[in-house]
Amino acid sequence: MNLQEYEKVQNFTYLEYCDYLQKKYGIGLSDYMTKSWNKNNKVTRTKEGLLAHHKFEDHAILLSTREFAMQNPFEWQLAKNIVYCDYLEHLLLHILICEYPSNDKNVLEFVGIGGVVNFIVPELNDYYSGWETNQNWRKTCHDLIKNDKDVYFILIKRFKAFLNKCSLDTNVLYSSFNEKYGLWSKQQNESLFNEIAAL
């Protein structure tokens, strides 16, 4: 997602943005899970740089994992409820979930935020600090957003505003996804962290 497109969609609600992305990329190529709750590899579009997002993540967390998926309706795994997106579109989806959680969300589940602080932001911090993956599918996904660091910062600024509004600690943004694997470190993200702090 480039800046021009972000400016077009920035005021969408979560469900409006899901509809927009499904019009842009189409619905799931298949159901995300099989009837036995295993991931269906036919749903993947990473060769195009796209990730698969569950539309019902505004209701429940971690729907791409068997353990959490099984605790929720199978309908949420259907192709019609899969939204394709690039990494920055995925980040915006999760920010919008934080801003527009479903009134029917699972009790005691804080939807949206975990995707931002545990997965998407830590990886993009590393990527925009110079980390290069050796996984072909991930490289294809990164290549799709390589020229859109400005959009990343706009999204981070927006998410910081959400955290501040909810009196949550913005330090959760200063992370590295690959540090736990010994492939990168927070220190290597320091310059980016300074830019985030200034937003």
Residue map of PLM features:
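Short, charged surface segments at domain edges that flank catalytic/cofactor-binding sites
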Residues: 1-43, 74-76
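Generic detection of long, well-ordered alpha-helical segments
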Residues: 11, 83, 87-90, 142, ...
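Histidine-centered nuclease catalytic patch
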Residues: 40-84
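Generic structural signal for hydrophobic core residues of well-folded globular domains
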Residues: 59, 96-100, 123, 166
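"Short basic amphipathic alpha-helical interaction patches in structured regions
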Residues: 66-73, 99, 108-110, 116
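Short Cys/His-centered divalent metal-binding micro-motifs
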Residues: 82-112
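C-terminal/domain-terminus segments
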Residues: 103-133
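Pan-zinc metallopeptidase signature
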Residues: 130-199
